């Protein structure tokens, strides 16, 4: 499903909610975001949409959205999967967005009525001038997991104490507990520079 189709499927649920805000987040990124800071920024800017970005190196093989913004943080350019040669640094959207709940419901309803199919292309990119879209620049550690290569790379980064401290040090993180069999190491196994749970 596309993001727009997924949102259309949950409009009934969103309509019954009383919360003022909706935070959309994909599961392919690792960061320790303080959502209260992002929500405060969203309110301060009186934004329709707040997109969280991270300044990072990108490669031509990556699937990503590059965001350009003015000095106030208002998004004025969106490039979906831009063509680049080699590697470049850019403000990359990390698949976290904040909306006012009722605004999101209206946006999805209007988009479906107009036959829009892509949230990024039909809503974000085409409506930059009519919507108040702001960028929240996240400056902490972020790991985008887009391939086996990036999965391995970011797992190796966790061996760095500074990275672990940034992700796990300041605030508690709660996850679903899954009791499963532990790792098993044979008599001839050699393990170095590893974190084992």
Regions found by a protein language model. Give the residues of each.
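A generic secondary-structure signal
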Residues: 9-13, 41, 55, 126
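Conserved core of the sugar-phosphate nucleotidyltransferase
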Residues: 18, 32-102
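Hydrophobic/aromatic beta-strand patches that form the interior of the parallel beta-sheet core
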Residues: 23-25, 50-52, 134-136, 143
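Short histidine/acidic/glycine/proline-rich micro-motifs that form metal-
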Residues: 28-29, 57-58, 141-142
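Left-handed beta-helix
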Residues: 102, 110-197
């Amino acid at each position: 499903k596309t993001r727009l189709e997924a949102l259309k499927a949950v409009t009934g649920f969103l309509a019954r909610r009383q919360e003022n805000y909706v935070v959309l987040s994909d599961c392919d990124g690792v960061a320790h975001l303080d959502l209260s800071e992002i929500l405060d920024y969203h309110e301060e800017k009186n934004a329709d949409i707040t997109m969280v970005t991270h300044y990072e190196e990108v490669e031509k093989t990556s699937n990503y959205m590059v965001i350009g913004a003015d000095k106030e943080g208002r998004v004025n350019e969106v490039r979906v999967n831009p063509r680049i040669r080699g590697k470049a640094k850019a403000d990359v959207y990390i698949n976290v967005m904040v909306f006012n709940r009722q605004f999101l419901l209206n946006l999805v309803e209007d988009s479906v009525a107009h036959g829009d199919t892509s949230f990024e292309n039909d809503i974000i990119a085409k409506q930059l001038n009519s919507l108040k879209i702001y960028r929240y620049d996240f400056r902490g550690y972020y790991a985008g997991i887009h391939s086996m290569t990036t999965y391995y790379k970011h797992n190796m980064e966790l061996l760095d104490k500074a990275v672990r401290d940034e992700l796990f040090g300041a605030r508690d993180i709660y996850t679903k507990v899954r009791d499963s069999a532990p790792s098993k190491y044979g008599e001839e196994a050699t393990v170095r520079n590893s974190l084992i749970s």
